[in-house]
Amino acid sequence: MRRLFSILLSAFLLLGLAPIVNAAGEAVNADRAATDFTASALTTCSENTRFNERASQATTPKDIARFERYSKASCGDDGLPHLVIAATIEPWGALANRHHEGDILIPGHIFIYVAGIIGWSGREYLRASKKTKNPAENEIIIDFALARQCLIKGAAWPVEANKQGRSGDLREKDENISLNGPR
């Protein structure tokens, strides 16, 4: 039953069968009156008066370059760039809408990969330190040689997680988990 549930959950997440929220309707902002917001209300930032006012106040070359880069984006009436991704082609929206992959797809994958490296390296360090003669000391005083080895191994965490998931080594056995503590 657990396996069936995990397969169904994975399929729902992969296929994007979750309800989609539309960004249309009343948008109430604290600094101005309620406006009817849709993606069609956005204009090119280079044509937006509030964006141009903000761009004219740029003083450093870095700020000027940033405003030039943002001038190609879509701005709302507040003069700030907005990211629009069509929800009609989900879950493959970022793949079909290639000019937004630098906004969400690539940074999201990098974040997940780096977070996985950190988590997997920490997990491997704790598992390796349990095999030493004084594991409690290795948790307090970090053995940098062991930590470096675990960090290097952590780069392959997706492959290792898949291997350990198939072999059953990824999860702790139920008999090794205590029920002490608040309930």
From Swiss-Prot:
Bias (Basic and acidic residues): 166-176
Annotated S-S bridges: none
InterPro entries: PSI_PsaF, PSI_PsaF_sf
Keywords: Membrane, Photosynthesis, Photosystem I, Signal, Thylakoid, Transmembrane, Transmembrane helix
Signal peptide: 1-23
Subcellular location: Cellular thylakoid membrane
One Pfam family linked to the record: PSI_PsaF
UniProt membrane topology term: Single-pass membrane protein
One GO CC term, this protein: plasma membrane-derived thylakoid membrane
GO biological process, one term: photosynthesis
Region (Disordered): 164-183
Residues passing through the membrane, by range: 102-122
Keyword Calcium: no
Job of this protein: Probably participates in efficiency of electron transfer from plastocyanin to P700 (or cytochrome c553 in algae and cyanobacteria). This plastocyanin-docking protein contributes to the specific association of plastocyanin to PSI.
Family statement: Belongs to the PsaF family.
Full protein name: Photosystem I reaction center subunit III
Annotated organism of origin: Prochlorococcus marinus (strain SARG / CCMP1375 / SS120)
Gene giving rise to this polypeptide: psaF
